[in-house]
């Protein structure tokens, strides 16, 4: 049964239902927490010693504020699209709980405060790179790429892959190849992650006229693309060990995680049910989260074969 969706008129806000939880929801806290985990790992891997708690706190707070601001802007720009999709129709803006004007003010405050924290207590490089990531996600991806090309996730994924680099520069004030390798891992992880969701929500995206890969090239083509990207991810994930960046704990952990992701991608390729795509999507989140935890454990408990 299809779920009816709709949007409140843009000039009508349900003030009686206005609540801080609506603003909190617009920051996409679960997504931001995963981003901050990858930023934290970037910080830790950048140093052989314990990180200053001031840099740790200021860095994660500033990156978190700017990431949250990007999420809020995404809510504003996508409010009409969100109203047409069952998955997003209950968000605060389609429901008329928060006006675009108030949301933009909220995003502006988060942006200014986040940038100043990074500029004043971390370093300018991190502040500028984090601001660039906000622009890349909230404006280049959300306003243009998402609506323009089925490769939106591939190109726009770079902004979402940046946090490990931001964490690294927060500690070192320098861009290092090891940090870029962490970015590359997330960059390659992003397409199969989102395409699995896009398969599950293909009708939603088609209704909203968003050119996601399943809508433009078909579900079978998308399944093949997911499998190929997952194979590429498994190969790329070995590089940190091969260049001496990580030890045996990471090699074993990442191999097990990639084997799991490959299992789901292979199963999805030949599945005809409606649930495998969502299972693949959910596992991809676990994959990235645990992969970066394994990186952290390996860094502080290093041993090699």
Swiss-Prot record:
<dbReference type="InterPro" id="IPR000537">
    <property type="entry name" value="UbiA_prenyltransferase"/>
</dbReference>
<keyword id="KW-0808">Transferase</keyword>
<comment type="function">
    <text>Converts heme B (protoheme IX) to heme O by substitution of the vinyl group on carbon 2 of heme B porphyrin ring with a hydroxyethyl farnesyl side group.</text>
</comment>
<feature type="transmembrane region" description="Helical">
    <location>
        <begin position="179"/>
        <end position="199"/>
    </location>
</feature>
<keyword id="KW-0350">Heme biosynthesis</keyword>
<feature type="transmembrane region" description="Helical">
    <location>
        <begin position="31"/>
        <end position="51"/>
    </location>
</feature>
<keyword id="KW-1003">Cell membrane</keyword>
<dbReference type="GO" id="GO:0005886">
    <property type="term" value="C:plasma membrane"/>
</dbReference>
<feature type="transmembrane region" description="Helical">
    <location>
        <begin position="103"/>
        <end position="123"/>
    </location>
</feature>
<dbReference type="InterPro" id="IPR006369">
    <property type="entry name" value="Protohaem_IX_farnesylTrfase"/>
</dbReference>
<dbReference type="InterPro" id="IPR044878">
    <property type="entry name" value="UbiA_sf"/>
</dbReference>
<dbReference type="GO" id="GO:0048034">
    <property type="term" value="P:heme O biosynthetic process"/>
</dbReference>
<feature type="transmembrane region" description="Helical">
    <location>
        <begin position="231"/>
        <end position="251"/>
    </location>
</feature>
<dbReference type="Pfam" id="PF01040">
    <property type="entry name" value="UbiA"/>
</dbReference>
<feature type="transmembrane region" description="Helical">
    <location>
        <begin position="152"/>
        <end position="172"/>
    </location>
</feature>
<comment type="pathway">
    <text>Porphyrin-containing compound metabolism; heme O biosynthesis; heme O from protoheme: step 1/1.</text>
</comment>
<keyword id="KW-0997">Cell inner membrane</keyword>
<feature type="transmembrane region" description="Helical">
    <location>
        <begin position="125"/>
        <end position="145"/>
    </location>
</feature>
<keyword id="KW-0472">Membrane</keyword>
<dbReference type="InterPro" id="IPR030470">
    <property type="entry name" value="UbiA_prenylTrfase_CS"/>
</dbReference>
<keyword id="KW-0812">Transmembrane</keyword>
<protein>
    <recommendedName>
        <fullName>Protoheme IX farnesyltransferase 2</fullName>
        <ecNumber>2.5.1.141</ecNumber>
    </recommendedName>
</protein>
<comment type="similarity">
    <text>Belongs to the UbiA prenyltransferase family. Protoheme IX farnesyltransferase subfamily.</text>
</comment>
<feature type="transmembrane region" description="Helical">
    <location>
        <begin position="277"/>
        <end position="297"/>
    </location>
</feature>
<feature type="transmembrane region" description="Helical">
    <location>
        <begin position="53"/>
        <end position="73"/>
    </location>
</feature>
<keyword id="KW-1133">Transmembrane helix</keyword>
<dbReference type="GO" id="GO:0008495">
    <property type="term" value="F:protoheme IX farnesyltransferase activity"/>
</dbReference>
